[in-house]
């Protein structure tokens, strides 16, 4: 048990250090250097001046990755906020109100989740003009369903408990029950799902930008940088390896953090399996 939580604490430390480093680095790089073309410095090798070299337009790769993190992570956070607001709200009402509202939401979710998420996201993104903002809409349209289903499940398990029955008996307003009594019960599970989905959404955004449905040049974004580096994989592989590595490391950190949060949540509930 001690080893399990020592491992989790290490993961939390790495997660915090990663976020801290990404924030601090934003103050040491200029967004102008990430887009400014300098044809006299194309394909510069790795050096102290250019930590990852330069690309085919003479732009510093390290700077573009750091500024690209701003675009990728900001859009990911914005997408998660939209997903949580929509998903949790629908889940609360579906679980509390029951009746036709619950049946309608559940049937819609059953249909939506029967199709692979990424296929739907690609189909939706292809209808919009390529941009990061349209990716927010496309991903939100499909991802809210998981949050609605999770929220409804938790609400259903809470509805038969004495504190909810007493609140209803004393005619406590529905809004008060939903916000003050039920919402705190779902927050831990929602946070775990958000952290796990953070990595998935980064992958979606990067993948869609890679195939031309997301960020457009010259905006630095990790997926768009992958698309650009693909053309130089033989002559200058660092242009592909650098953004791919950052994407992989970021997703891994968020996935491990999500697993650690889930383990801690289960431990608090007394459901943790030590053989896990």
UniProtKB/Swiss-Prot annotation:
Gene3D superfamilies: MetI-like. Keywords: Cell membrane, Ion transport, Membrane, Nickel, Nickel transport, Transmembrane, Transmembrane helix, Transport. It is a multi-pass membrane protein. Residues 69-258 form the ABC transmembrane type-1 domain. It is found in: Cell membrane. It holds the Pfam family BPD_transp_1. GO terms for cellular component: plasma membrane. SUPFAM superfamilies: MetI-like. Disulfide bonds: none annotated. Belongs to the binding-protein-dependent transport system permease family. OppBC subfamily. The complex is composed of two ATP-binding proteins (NikD and NikE), two transmembrane proteins (NikB and NikC) and a solute-binding protein (NikA). NCBIfam families: Opp2C. Part of the ABC transporter complex NikABCDE (Opp2) involved in nickel import. Probably responsible for the translocation of the substrate across the membrane. This is Nickel import system permease protein NikC. It comes from Staphylococcus aureus (strain bovine RF122 / ET3-1). The gene is nikC.
């Amino acid at each position: 048990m001690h080893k399990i939580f020592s491992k989790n604490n290490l993961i939390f430390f790495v997660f915090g250090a990663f976020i801290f480093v990404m924030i601090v680095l934003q103050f040491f790089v200029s967004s102008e250097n990430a887009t400014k073309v300098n044809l006299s410095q194309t394909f510069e090798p790795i050096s102290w001046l250019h930590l990852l070299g330069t690309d085919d337009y003479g732009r510093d790769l390290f700077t573009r990755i750091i500024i690209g993190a701003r675009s990728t992570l900001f859009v990911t956070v914005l997408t998660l906020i939209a997903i949580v607001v929509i998903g949790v709200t629908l889940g609360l009402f579906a679980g509390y109100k029951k009746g036709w509202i619950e049946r309608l939401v559940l049937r819609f979710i059953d249909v939506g989740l029967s199709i692979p998420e990424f296929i739907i996201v690609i189909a939706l993104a292809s209808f919009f003009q390529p941009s990061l903002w349209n990716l927010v809409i496309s991903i939100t349209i499909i991802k809210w369903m998981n949050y609605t289903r999770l929220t409804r499940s938790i609400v259903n398990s809470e509805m038969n408990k004495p504190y909810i029955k007493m609140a209803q008996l004393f005619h406590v307003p529905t809004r008060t029950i939903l916000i003050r009594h039920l919402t705190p019960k779902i927050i831990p599970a929602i946070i775990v799902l958000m952290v796990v989905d953070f990595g998935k959404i980064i992958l979606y955004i990067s993948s869609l930008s890679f195939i031309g449905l997301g960020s457009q040049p010259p905006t630095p974004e990790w997926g768009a940088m992958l698309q650009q580096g693909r053309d130089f994989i033989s002559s200058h592989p660092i242009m592909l390896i650098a953004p791919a590595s950052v994407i992989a490391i970021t997703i891994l950190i968020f996935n491990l953090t999500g697993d650690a949060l889930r383990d801690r949540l289960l431990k608090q509930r007394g459901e943790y399996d030590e053989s896990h």
